[in-house]
Amino acid sequence: MPRRKKKIKEASEGQNLEKKDLETTSSVSIKKKRRLEDLFIVISDSDGEETKEENGLQKMKTKQSNRSKCLAKRKIAQMSEEEQFALALKMSEQEAKEVNNQEEKEEELLRKAIAESLNSRWSSDASAARPRPLSTGPSSHPHQDSTKDSGTTEGIWQLAPPSLCKGSQISQGNEAEEGKEPWDHSENPEEEPLSGSSGSQDQSSRPVFENEKVKCFDRCTGHLAEHTQCGKPQESTGSGCAFPKAVQGRGDTSRQCLPTPADTKGLQDIGGTVHYYWGVPFCPAGVDPDQYTSVILCQLEVYQKSLKMAQRQLVKKRGFGEPVLPRPPFLIQNECGQEEQTSEKHEGLSEDVRAGAREERQGSGASVWHSETKDSQKSPITSLKQRLLLEEEPTTGRGQSSQGLFVEETSEEVLKSSEGDDAVPASQSIAVLTSKRDLVLMPEASTEEVTVCPETQLSSFEPLDLNGEDSVDGREIPTELGMTVSNRQVDNREAGKDSRPPAVSASARVSCPLCNQDFPPTKIEQHAMYCTGLMEPETVLTRRRREAKKKSDGRTAAQPALDISRKEKCYLCKSLVPLGEYQCHVETCLQLANVDRENGTEGMRRPRVCAPVEGKPKQRLRKSKEKGHSQGRLLSLLEQSEHRTTGVERTPKCSEAGAFRMPSPDVEEAGCSRERQSSLSKLNLNESPIKSFVPVSEATNCLVDFKGQFAFRSQTKSGRGRRRKS
């Protein structure tokens, strides 16, 4: 049983497929019939009367379509989903193809219909234009040709200006097929070569011209140009005219060619008339077309000329300025000098002042000072200038060393010139020099100065005030020391200046134990801090180091002298000591403590009264070496005192402290003087104070445990990290 059912199903499916094929073929044939019927569309001027045959065909079409729809519905109902889907795809593809083909055919039919209507209109225009005269000449013989387009008609084909008929040619060129054929012209020297191109028509509607002479009229120049036309010209589809086109192309719309016979007198009588043709522009009703087109051409010419004028005004070439070139600094200084010259003229200064200022500005570096020393003998202005500069220089630090190089030569000449010469008032010269001070020093400021270290040069020409230095530093300079002291005077560079008193009569100087050079007492400590033991006659000082020296000198000078009245507490004897005597007092206390430690209890009973030294003021030791040793001993004694205070040794310490408090100030002064003499005798000048320095990491007597401190911090940090993680 099931086998028979399968066979029946297969047979039914085969029948269904055959029916579908028949339906598709019938539908295709019906559509083809529709296309054929559509092809036979006739464009006519009638109102579209329908014939009886068309009505019968439409009835048959409707019946067949209804039948095919019913059959298709039945077949689709019997088909499976996959078959229905495949059938739908096929049907959609076929419909799409049919629609595309139908659209293409309709477009072709429309083009043909438009071309036929245009051909019929051209024939009517040609017949209407026959009685219209185109020129007022005595003879006009236009060429005629017979064309065959639904009848034989005769027309006149004329050359029209390209500016008038260009728009119609473009608008109608898309609808008809176009072709191009060259024109050959014999050139006139007054006219540019022309070439024409126009839309092509069918061979039946194409007129033929052979060896026709055409004359073109140029409105701009007013000349006529003859051209022989060979070959087969083509007419435009819009107006039935062949248009020449300018190849060289100036954009000139006023050039045009007029149709003329072989005789040239007719065109000369016409002059500048413009013939109007339908198309472009469309002339309004009631207006002469020739006048209308001539007005439009004039407007185009005016517009073109105004446009060119505007473009010429817009484009203007701008001149370039002078190039900006880098200039060396001396040129800039010369310009500054020129500006100053103008300002000096307004101020009414003399010519010698300006000459001296120019000469001084041109120098740079060390040459400035040499030129000043030479010019100081000639003009008093330069000497006053040097005097002002010397007064402005600071008296401490590098100021003394820089002044000592040139002041000795010019100091006497300044005085002589200031007394002898009174040509220029002093007030004016000083004002001018103060205003120009910065410009004189410009070359020095531009380059980094290379100065000589003040410690390696002689002292300044001013006498040293020992009492003043003591008050500034808060210390006392020893007058009689068991050290190498040399008394030097400033060397005079000129032999005639020996009678002048020396700048420094007898100044105490201290020699450095490393480099064996002499320095004043106020400079030896600063030199010892940076001394390396090498002989450096000249050291380079940068601006930063000079500024640092200035600041340090200013700080030492700004220390108040009232620091002497301050009192500090001695941690050995527990007594208040003036600040000036504190160091000496501490040293004596330490020495006494060492002696007591060696001799036992005898040191406490021994009187500490020393014979006073008469005729000597209060003095102190200033060696930084002893400072380092005393600091180390002070720390050790502090540790011992802390150990003694705990336990049995507390009472003797108190008695010892009481013994230290007892002595009077006179006794302490005597002890200080005696200990100072003994310490001076034991001084070794070959040892530098920098050698006694002990770094913090190697200090054994220090109370602070740096290693333990660091370990404790690391433990705390690790503990914090663990807490945060938890």
Swiss-Prot record:
Residues 400-507 are annotated as: Necessary for interaction with NR6A1 C-terminus. The keyword rRNA-binding does not apply. Residues 97-103 are annotated as: UIM-linker. The modification Phosphoserine is found at residues 29, 44, 46, 140, 205, 379, 402, 427, 636, 664, 688. Residues 80-99, 104-124 form the UIM domain. Residues 100-200 are annotated as: Necessary for interaction with NR6A1 N-terminus. One of its GO terms (biological process) is negative regulation of DNA-templated transcription. Residues 270-400 are annotated as: AIR. A motif (LR motif) lies at residues 60-78. Residues 1-27, 47-67, 93-112, 119-208, 356-411, 611-675 are annotated as: Disordered. Keywords: Chromatin regulator, DNA damage, DNA repair, Isopeptide bond, Metal-binding, Nucleus, Phosphoprotein, Repeat, Transcription, Transcription regulation, Ubl conjugation, Zinc, Zinc-finger. One of its GO terms (cellular component) is BRCA1-A complex. A zinc finger (UBZ4-type) spans 509-536. PANTHER family: BRCA1-A COMPLEX SUBUNIT RAP80 (PTHR15932:SF2), UBIQUITIN INTERACTION MOTIF-CONTAINING PROTEIN 1 (PTHR15932). Ubiquitin-binding protein. Specifically recognizes and binds 'Lys-63'-linked ubiquitin. Plays a central role in the BRCA1-A complex by specifically binding 'Lys-63'-linked ubiquitinated histones H2A and H2AX at DNA lesions sites, leading to target the BRCA1-BARD1 heterodimer to sites of DNA damage at double-strand breaks (DSBs). The BRCA1-A complex also possesses deubiquitinase activity that specifically removes 'Lys-63'-linked ubiquitin on histones H2A and H2AX. Also weakly binds monoubiquitin but with much less affinity than 'Lys-63'-linked ubiquitin. Belongs to the RAP80 family. Component of the ARISC complex, at least composed of UIMC1/RAP80, ABRAXAS1, BRCC3/BRCC36, BABAM2 and BABAM1/NBA1. Component of the BRCA1-A complex, at least composed of the BRCA1, BARD1, UIMC1/RAP80, ABRAXAS1, BRCC3/BRCC36, BABAM2 and BABAM1/NBA1. In the BRCA1-A complex, interacts directly with ABRAXAS1. Interacts with UBE2I. Interacts with NR6A1. Interacts with ESR1. Interacts with TSP57. Interacts with TRAIP. This is BRCA1-A complex subunit RAP80. It comes from Rattus norvegicus (Rat).
